[in-house]
Amino acid sequence: RTGIIRRHIVEADTTVSMAAQAAEKALESAKMLPEEIDLLIVSTISSNVILPCTACEVQKQIHAVHATCFDLNAACTGFLFAYNTAQAYIASGMYKNVLVIGAESLSSLVDWKDRSTCILFGDGAGAVVLRAEEGESYHMVTHSDGSKGEALTCDTGSFMKMDGQEVFKFAVRQVPACIAEVMEHNHLMAEDIDYFILHQANRRIVEAVAKRMKVELTKFPMNLQEYGNTSSASIPLLLDEMNRE
């Protein structure tokens, strides 16, 4: 039902080491040196330690000596919030070259006896480099609903707990609405869009979103069958695969 065939679980690696590897590959792809990065943001809910922040640890490993660093915690939406934050900093003129990383070791937060979560989540990291460019525009639509917070929780020193049905209903209702809002602002129709890049939660959610939007499923790339739900890492992992193809 989930569409997940396999997942990847860390053994020797950590959230920091995966994030650093993803960062190095992103910089290589962008043909940039680490010292050119002036802001480094890591989105994660599975840091190795509380302090120092994961972004500072990544900075140390990749030698991004000029980067300001901080972490961001927004769970599965984390990469998008980090991306939007990076874009806002670039638009303000404060920073020009920003490295955004989504990295998770969710296996450390999973109760392997709880089938509502243990069959879904995996470990991974992905990264993108954003650069200031003349004439580029970007429109974001973001919303939050704290009243739904109990649908997915993780107490300190405990495991993730999820109300799968509530998460499904919320995603299928709100994701199409946000997409419609973005398209309306940009005067676009679904047929104008090549791909809709969604968080890779599970296949049922992606299929339900496509159905509600009345858009063919081929416009919704998926790699969740290979990685499972990697929270903050899922969108940059998918973007990287599509970029390499």
Feature locations, PLM:
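Anion-binding (especially nucleotide phosphate/pyrophosphate-binding) glycine-rich loop
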Residues: 29, 33-65
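Short, well-ordered, mixed-charge alpha-helical segments that flank or form enzyme active sites
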Residues: 49-51, 78-81, 106-110, 146-148
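Conserved beta-strand-centric core segments of catalytic alpha/beta enzyme folds
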Residues: 83-144, 238-245
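Acidic-glycine-rich active-site phosphate/pyrophosphate-binding loop
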Residues: 49-63, 99-106, 150, 154, ...
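Phosphate/pyrophosphate-binding loops at sites that engage ATP/ADP/AMP, CoA/4′-phosphopantetheine
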Residues: 22-38, 177-194, 242-245
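Condensing-enzyme catalytic core mediating Claisen C-C bond formation in acyl metabolism
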Residues: 1-12, 113-173, 177
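A short, small-residue-rich loop immediately preceding and capping a beta-strand
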Residues: 38-42, 68, 97-104
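Claisen-condensing/thiolase-fold acyl-transfer catalytic domains that form or cleave C-C bonds
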Residues: 16, 20-23, 27, 46-47, ...
